[in-house]
Structures are given as C-alpha cells and as structure tokens.
Amino acid sequence: MKIGLCESRVKEIRQAYEVGFDFVEVSNWAVYTMEDSKYEDMIKLSKELPEGFMYACNGLVPPDFRLTGPDVNYDTIRDFAEKSFAKLAKLGIKMLVFGSSKAKIVPEGFDFDEAMGQLIKVTQIFGEVAEKNGQRVCIEPLRTEECNIINTAEDSVKLAKDTGCANVGGHVDYYHLMQNGEKMSKLEGLAKDIVHTHIASPCKRNIPTVDDGADYGQFFNYLRKGGYDATVSFEGGGDKTPENLTALCAYLRSL
C-alpha cells in the first residue's frame, strides 16, 4: 500500500518526499487561492519530484459553498470545479477527496431525501469534470459530530454507485470510522468499492504510533482481505518533525 501525507506547503511537501512518503495529498482550496507565484512554485516542485508524488487532494470545496439545501447553485459548483480541478491537474493530482463537511451539512428542516439527490447531482458534476482531467473522485464519510449526511463507508459507496460515474468511488477514514463507533469488519465487504483511505489516531486525530492503543493493523487487514491495497494518507495533527514523520512512514509500512 502506498503511504501519503496531507500537506500543501512547498517546504513540507519536499520534506515528505525526503522522509520516505510515496505521495502527498494537498488542499484544493489552498491551491485554488494561492498567489500566482506560489502556484508556479508548486508546479515547479511537481516537476522536480517523481511523477505522481502530488497524487491526491482534499478540501474539495470551501465551507461557504452550499451543496445541500435551498441555496444550491449547480452552475457555480460546476464553474468552481472546472477551474480548480484544472489547476490540480497541472500538479499531477489524480485523486480528489470529497469530504467538505460544512458545505454538505443538510440545513435544519430541509428534506433529507432531497438533500441526498442534490449530493448525487453535485458528485456527478465533480465526476464529469474530473474525468476530463484524468482524475477520480472519492467520497469521504465523516463522523456524525461533523456532518449529518454521508457518515459511513456504506453511505460513501452507495453515493458513488448512485452517481453512475465510473471514476467516482468510496472512501474510508480510520478516525471518522472509530469516532462513529462503526464495526471494522464491514470493510472487508466494502473494500472492492473503496479507492482511497485516510488514517489518524482515533482520539486526538494525531500521528498514529505503535503504543497509542489503537489497532491500526485490523483496519489494514480487513481492507486487504477485501482486495484493497491502494493508498492511505495521514490526515491529522501532531508534531510533524522529520523524525516523527519518518517513524510514521515506517510504522504504516509495517502494518
């Protein structure tokens, strides 16, 4: 399995490569709002690093976008996707992680089924635009405290299938899975429809370590039993020194 780090700054991306990560996952919103000079620095760096090192992105839409509710504007969403996905493509980004909790939250009193229909259409737009750029979209399920729709790996896989887009797939995040109290064993049956994953410690969303009490091996074992052996990114906080990141990279490879 390829091991990645969520990071959008040039210095830290270079450090991720130097300590042994296989790829980085940048923030779409960070890239989209970069000053031109900084974006050019990112393009230059992407050409200096091995092809595919800038592999994924998260933060797909800004929090003030509305993807559910009465204020959804599909033209605005498509326009943003067209512009931002193209900028990502110039960096070599191939996997787009669609979490975006604040933008997805269903407003109080709004019909849930209608909101789900909106998300299907939004994800179809993302899938169509991504396909033109040679990219895939994965739908990240989020803990219930953070979002009130698309909370489980089952939700993620179902939404991906409902779009009818071949380049849209499921996702699972160890931290969100554990926060929701979900059963790890279900991943074996879902793995064939998952295309990317995240990991972080289940309590403080920090760097996973061998002695933090979490059973990360079980997470990987169920995914591999189901046929998944693609990519996992560390998405979380903690003291990201070169020493700690080197240890993290080695630890995740050992699982």
Per-region residue spans from a language model:
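Histidine-acidic metal/acid-base catalytic patches
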Residues: M1-G4, R9-G20, R78-D79, K83-A86, ...
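N-terminal substrate-binding region of glycoside hydrolase catalytic domains
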Residues: Q15-Y39, N58-R66
